[in-house]
Regions:
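Catalytic core of Fe(II)/2-oxoglutarate
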Residues: 106-163
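Short, hydrophobic/aromatic-rich beta-strand segments within well-structured domains
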Residues: 80, 104-106
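Conserved beta-strand termini and adjacent loop/short-helix elements that scaffold enzyme active sites
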Residues: 7, 82-84, 118
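Conserved short histidine dyad/triad with adjacent acidic residue
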Residues: 80-98
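Non-heme Fe(II)/2-oxoglutarate
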Residues: 1-73
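Alpha-helical and His/Cys-centered functional microenvironments
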Residues: 43, 97, 147
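A short coil-to-beta-strand element that immediately follows conserved catalytic motifs
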Residues: 72-80
Length: 163
């Protein structure tokens, strides 16, 4: 039901190099207060940024697909990279509210855990982030990204979405 799959993708460094190039070109969208695509739920607003597939060049998209399992590639309808810098967070929510039927999260960085989910018994769990690892959870799982502290490096994650 809840599963961490290590080494789900093996070319994280290549992906991150291209993501950082896109970031330097201003391709990320502000999802926070005053942003162009805010993320909010009944629990409040989030503050982070996203690089949508529509804003990625072909080279980055192909690099993401490069080591994804073939069975995943043919059904993924959207890829998104989320960035959380110090002070950023993602408010508690369910992906099922977004209109898609499956979601997988791939960590592109590692460090102090911030991805929190609530299981079927409403027990909180923090997931240890590891580069290239994928976290699979039921679409209706409540989850959040806790606030990144000021002394932490930015965190990046790859979202695979099935619509």
């Amino acid at each position: 039901m809840y599963e961490v799959v290590n080494d789900y993708i093996t070319n994280v460094d290549d992906i991150m190099q291209k993501v950082l190039e896109h970031e330097a070109q201003g391709k990320f969208t502000n999802r926070g207060i005053g942003g162009t695509d805010t993320h909010a739920t009944i629990y409040g607003e989030s503050h982070f940024s996203s690089l949508y597939e529509k804003d990625m060049n072909e080279d980055l998209v192909e690099t993401v697909w490069e080591t994804l399992p073939e069975s995943e590639r043919k059904w993924v309808s959207q890829i998104v990279v989320n960035k959380y810098k110090p002070g950023d967070w993602l408010v508690k929510h369910q992906d099922s509210a977004g209109g898609y039927w499956q979601f997988k999260l791939v960590f592109l960085t590692e460090g102090k855990p911030h991805f929190k989910y609530w299981d079927k018994d409403d027990t909180e769990h923090l997931v240890q982030e590891k580069k290239g690892a994928m976290f699979k959870m039921p679409i209706e799982t409540w989850h959040e990204v806790t606030k990144i502290e000021k002394d932490e490096d930015p965190k990046y994650s790859l979202c695979l979405i099935w619509e």
